[in-house]
Each structure stands twice: as structure tokens, then as C-alpha cells.
Amino acid sequence: MVPQTHGLLLLYFLLQLQGPLGAVVFITQEEAHGVLHRQRRANSLLEELWSSSLERECNEERCSFEEAREIFKSPERTKQFWTIYSDGDQCASNPCQNGGTCQDHLKSYVCFCPLDFEGRNCEKNKNEQLICANENGDCDQYCRDHVGTKRTCSCHEDYVLQPDEVSCKPKVEYPCGRIPVVEKRNFSRPQGRIVGGYVCPKGECPWQAVLKFNEALLCGAVLLDTRWIVTAAHCFDKFGKLVNITVVLGEHDFSEKEGTEQVRLVEQVIMPNKYTRGRTDHDIALVRLHRPVTFTDYVVPLCLPERAFSENTLASIRFSRVSGWGQLLDRGATALELMVIEVPRLMTQDCLEHAKHSANTPRITENMFCAGYMDGTKDACKGDSGGPHATHYHGTWYLTGVVSWGEGCAAIGHIGVYTRVSQYIDWLVKYMDSKLRVGISRVSLL
């Protein structure tokens, strides 16, 4: 070792200085200093003859960070060496699996995984995790699982799947579920103050329709296509014929004509044959207009989602929007401007439990869901019936419910009940493609 070499060299050097007995055996202070003085980095006299080296400075004896920096000259290389030198190589055990690359850090490591793997040690196969039940399979819109292979994504008919195989981009000028006036100015402007809601800025609820009888508010509705709207079946309980009933799209303020309105006559109403007048189950109706509307910045359809997507993904989103011109207060005046509120969806069990303890509350069925605030701060109201419960996902809005019934407007301890649209998607699609007689029809459910 170097210390032994130092001792032998010093002994040899002193012996060479000895002469006859009478000779001088001492050397000058400067000469002694040259032999005995320890330089800043040297560990022996012999080391002073060597250039700085990693082996000498850090492998044989403990070195400092400053000494390592002098050796490597590069901050990056010094840091890389020092991490391993002072902490040990955390990558020595090859913790990264499936071909992952390990990078050592102080008391830790990071794995850089191949394309199909993830996790701290690249232990998770993305294709195995990439299923529709897990965050909708990362799909923008619709997701389908396949046995033995990874899931596939698809899009609503107004959209086209992108090369990344997950994103959906519009392929028409006015795709469903988008709000042109917001996209063109890149922000929304809520203003003002349905109960506890606010005025929906003009054009920001472009799928909202209104049913009128003799020019008076009858019900809300929602646009699905150029000739079809959806509303609540109970809106037609008092009608045997479709006389003096009109639908207005592009409406915002009842007190003035704004030039964006499109008025259409009602040609046909289709409702489930299981709906009973005065009851609440199957409270949904498909309405055909006598001629198509024109899509504009203020008239855009709401997307009717695929059933699996609605039940598995949209139903798990807590807050959705409800809009309409209903009463601003219980037994109060109706709104002149279109109002909108955001309401939380309630767990089915909570909804059933609530209904069980409320007197005179209709039975909650699998064709309904509950939403709202138990404290009575926000709710849909009379006149909002038939309006949309719209849910937002990855930039697009979808129809998830139809305003059906409630126990007063925002009554404390009571909630709003909505028709669960996912139960009727196949039924709606089928009859939107059919040609039934003009008038009111009751047809079987699928």
C-alpha cells in the first residue's frame, strides 16, 4: 500500500543522509518540509510524483466531491459518479423489467420503459391494462374490448378517428356536442343568476329546444338531428292531437326576437307503449319536426352516445348540466332567458333510500336516476321538463338524461329525477330511422 511505500522511502532517504559518526545528521527546515509536508490531495511522497487519478483518489482511499470534480472536469459526469460512489449503484440489481433502461439516482432509480410497458419497474403491460373499464381505455369517445388483443377506439358518426387511434376530430362543420360560439372565442362567459343557476350565455346551450302550445311555454326538449328532438312523454299528457304545438330552436330570450330562432311544427310524437299517462316510468318521447332545421352557431345537436359508453363512462361523471326556462323559484315566475345549472348525480342506492323515506314519492325504477342538491339550492323546475341532462367528456357533450319529475322546485330534502337515456338509446336510434304515421304513436320497447 502507499503508506508502506512512504515509510520505506523515508527510511532510505534518511540513511542516505548519514555519514561518518561526526557528520551532521540534521537537515534544514525547508528540506524536511519537502519530505514530511502533506499536500492538499497527496497521501504520500510517492503520490506527489503521480498525476491525479480515480484509482488513487477515490478507489484506494476516500475522496471528497471536490476531488472527484477535479478528476472528471464535467458537472454531469461528476454528479453521475458521485451518486454511485456515495450511495451505491441502485441499478446494480437490474430492477427494470421487460427491457427497461435503469438510471441511478440518490437512494433511488428511474426505469425508462419500452413502449408497451409502464410501472415503477416496467412490470405492467399496457395492453393488459388498456381495457375499457379502465379510464375508458384512454379513448376520446367509444371503446370496445377484444379477447386476446387490446381494446379499440371509435367515434360518433360526426367525428373521425385520428392516426393515434384514440382521438376523435370533427368531420362536419357542426358536429354534435360541440359549442361553436365558445370554440370561436376560446372561453365561456357565465352571467346573471332554473333555481340557483345562471343565464346560459347566448349560443352556449345550442341543443336546447322549447315546446310551445299557443305560443306559451310547454316543455323543454333537446335536438338530436335535423328533424328529431327528445323530450318527456308527460309533456303530451293533455293532448290527443298535435295542434298548435310548435318547437323553437336557437331561442334564448323570450322577451325579444334575436334572429337566431328557427320555428318548426310537430309532425309526429313517438313514446314507449309502457308509458302510462300521469305516471313517471318510461317518461321519454321522440318528436319529429315537419321539416329539418339548419345547423348554425346557435343550433347544434347534442350527441346521443352509445349505450355502453353512457353506462360505463358518462354515468360515473358526477356533475352534468341541466338547462331550461322553468320557474326561477317554487311557484314563481318562469325565466325569460335560458338558464343552466350544474347538478351532481347521486348514487342509485342513495336515490332509492331517499325515495323510500319520502311520502308520496313515485317509485324509482331502473329507467331513472337522481341528481341535485339535498339542501334545495339548485334544481330543475316546472317548465324545464323534457330538457336535457348533458354530460361533458373529453371536449364533447352527450345526452344522458331528460328532466322528468321532482317534488317541488329545489325543495329542501328533495331531488330531481331524470329519465335514464341509456335505457332507450337503441329504441331512439331504431325509430329515428322509421316512418310511422303522423300524430302520436305508442310503440314497443326493444
Swiss-Prot record:
This is Coagulation factor VII. Residues 1-24 form the signal peptide. Heterodimer of a light chain and a heavy chain linked by a disulfide bond. Residues 87-123, 128-169 form the EGF-like domain. The modification 4-carboxyglutamate is found at residues 47-48, 55, 57, 60-61, 66-67, 70, 76. It catalyses: Selective cleavage of Arg-|-Ile bond in factor X to form factor Xa. Substrate binds at residue 379. It is found in: Secreted. SUPFAM superfamilies: EGF/Laminin, GLA-domain, Trypsin-like serine proteases. Keywords: Blood coagulation, Calcium, Cleavage on pair of basic residues, Disulfide bond, EGF-like domain, Gamma-carboxyglutamic acid, Glycoprotein, Hemostasis, Hydrolase, Hydroxylation, Protease, Repeat, Secreted, Serine protease, Signal, Zymogen. It comes from Rattus norvegicus (Rat). Residues 194-433 form the Peptidase S1 domain. Residues 42-86 form the Gla domain. Initiates the extrinsic pathway of blood coagulation. Serine protease that circulates in the blood in a zymogen form. Factor VII is converted to factor VIIa by factor Xa, factor XIIa, factor IXa, or thrombin by minor proteolysis. In the presence of tissue factor and calcium ions, factor VIIa then converts factor X to factor Xa by limited proteolysis. Factor VIIa also converts factor IX to factor IXa in the presence of tissue factor and calcium. Plasma. SMART domains: EGF (SM00181), EGF_CA (SM00179), GLA (SM00069), Tryp_SPc (SM00020).
